[in-house]
C-alpha cells in the first residue's frame, strides 16, 4: 500500500489497550502480550487477535550530568524502588546529592508496568520520592535540571539523533550502567545498547509486541507484517531497538584517539 498514510496515536499503555479492546484502533504496539481476559473480549467482538514480537528495548536509568556515580547493581536498583534506599549516600557514601527522586513518565505507562511486573516481581514501588513527569520527554527534562533525580525510561529515547550509527547516547544526561554482580564497577556494568540486549549483559530488557485485532484483515495487518519484515526490522534497528527477526552481526572495533 505505497499511497497509504498512517495516523499514529501516542498514548500510555492503559489507554492504548482500552482503545484496542473497544476496537477504536486495530493495531497496538506495546511491551506485553494480551491477558486471557483481553483476548476473550476481542474474540467476543469478532476479530481473532494476533500477537507477535517486533523488537526489544531496554529500561534505562538516567541521572543528572553533575552526578558522577553512574554504575549501579541490579540489587541496588531493586532496593531503591522498594524504598529501602532513599538517599544517594546510602548507595555511594561520598555522594552529596541528598534525597533520591525517582522519576517516571506516568502511572499508566508500560515502563512502570515493567518495573512492577518484572523488576519487582509484582510488588508495588515504595520509593518515598516519586515524581510523575507526564511523558518520556518530560522525564529527560526533569533529570536534566534536577541533580538528585534518577529517571526511568525506555532506552530508545536516549539515542543521540545526530549519530546515524545509534552507538552514542545524548550528552545532556548520564545513562547508568547496570551490573548483575554484587559490586558495580566500570568493567562489569553495562549500558542499554542493542548489542548488550542481544548477548544478555544488560539485565532490563523487554519485548515490544504488535497486537493486531482487525476484522477486515486489511491495512493494520499489512503494516504489522511490514514492521516484522526485512525493511521494517531495519527501521526498528535505526530507532535504537533490537529487531526481533533480523540477523544481527556484532563487530568489535578499536578507536584510536
What are these regions (language model features)?
Residues 25-31:
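Short, structured active-site "lid" loops
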Amino acid at each position: 500500500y505505497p499511497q497509504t498514510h498512517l495516523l499514529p496515536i501516542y498514548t500510555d499503555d492503559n489507554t492504548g489497550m482500552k482503545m484496542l479492546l473497544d476496537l477504536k484502533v486495530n493495531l497496538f504496539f506495546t511491551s506485553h502480550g494480551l491477558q486471557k481476559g483481553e483476548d476473550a473480549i476481542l474474540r467476543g467482538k469478532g476479530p481473532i487477535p494476533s500477537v507477535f514480537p517486533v523488537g526489544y528495548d531496554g529500561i534505562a536509568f538516567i541521572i543528572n550530568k553533575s552526578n558522577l556515580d553512574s554504575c549501579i547493581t541490579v540489587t541496588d536498583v531493586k532496593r531503591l524502588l522498594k524504598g529501602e534506599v532513599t538517599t544517594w549516600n546510602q548507595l555511594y557514601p561520598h555522594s552529596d546529592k541528598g534525597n533520591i527522586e525517582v522519576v517516571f513518565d506516568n502511572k499508566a505507562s508500560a515502563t512502570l508496568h515493567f518495573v512492577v511486573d518484572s523488576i519487582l516481581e509484582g510488588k508495588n514501588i515504595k520509593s518515598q520520592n516519586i515524581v510523575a513527569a507526564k511523558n518520556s520527554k518530560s522525564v529527560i527534562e526533569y533529570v536534566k535540571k534536577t541533580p538528585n533525580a534518577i529517571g526511568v525510561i525506555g532506552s530508545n529515547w536516549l539515542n543521540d539523533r545526530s549519530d546515524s550509527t545509534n552507538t552514542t547516547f545524548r550528552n545532556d544526561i548520564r545513562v547508568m550502567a547496570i551490573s548483575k554482580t554484587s559490586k558495580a564497577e566500570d568493567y562489569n556494568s553495562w549500558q542499554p545498547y542493542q548489542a548488550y540486549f542481544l548477548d544478555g549483559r544488560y539485565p532490563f530488557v523487554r519485548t515490544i509486541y504488535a497486537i493486531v485485532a482487525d476484522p477486515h484483515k486489511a491495512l493494520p495487518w499489512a503494516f504489522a507484517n511490514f514492521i516484522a519484515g526485512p525493511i521494517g526490522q531495519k527501521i526498528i534497528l535505526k530507532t535504537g531497538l533490537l529487531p526481533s527477526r533480523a540477523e544481527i552481526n556484532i563487530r568489535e572495533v578499536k578507536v584510536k584517539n
